[in-house]
Amino acid sequence: MAIISSHILDSVHGCSASGIRVQCQKILNRNGDHLVFEIEANEEGRIMEEVSFEDSGELFYQLIFFSDEYFRKKMAERYSGRQIVREIVIRLVLPDPETVSYTHLTLP
């Protein structure tokens, strides 16, 4: 078992991105992607999910942050629909969970 967690911030409004929808998908070769979990960030803009790994070795995942949907809800009356970024996708290679206890990824 491993835990995938994130603290998501809304830099437009200077607050936590509470309510943003996030998906975690396991990237499979030619068989498409497998949904691992889908969650909404809590009031502090945090997500935390336990994930079980059936395979060993490096595993390929992606986290998808639905930013357009988030801003559409947050700014309903002022939203122009002109977002050029609909989703933010972060692709990860997760090492064997038995060998790493904590990995921190900071994005600018």
Question: Which sequence ranges carry the predicted segments?
Answer:
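Beta-strand-dominated extracellular/periplasmic modules and repeats
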Residues: A2-P97
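Acidic, proline/serine/threonine- and glycine-rich low-complexity intrinsically disordered segments
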Residues: T99-S101
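Conserved small/polar residues in nucleotide/adenosyl-binding loops
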Residues: T103-P108
